[in-house]
Amino acid sequence: MEKLSVIVPCFNEQETLQDYYDAISKVRETLLGKECELQVILVDDGSKDKTLAKMKELSGQCSWIRYISFTRNFGKEAAIYAGLTHAEGEYVSLMDVDLQDPPELIPEMLDIIRQGEYDCVG
């Protein structure tokens, strides 16, 4: 089965992580129906709130969620790079945790990239 890794950089996102989890969990079910596993990599970029605690909670509940934690704020690009180095999927998506880009679009993007005409879909 193929795998899609979603890299999610986070900085002080304790309030939005649960909403993101709720949305991406539904997407996971859709992807499994398309013969694709989901791996979510949450990257804590030195948050000062309880973002890391929430990440630990979610990863403890779900084997398909992993987290990486920085000791201080290194910036979004460093968080993305760290996530990419741990991605296991044949496909990778970068996504902000604030749901600005709806996770519900991921299955449609997967369908497009699987057609083989494109190397990148956004």
Predicted regions and their residues:
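Structured catalytic core of nucleotide-sugar glycosyltransferases
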Residues: M1-G122
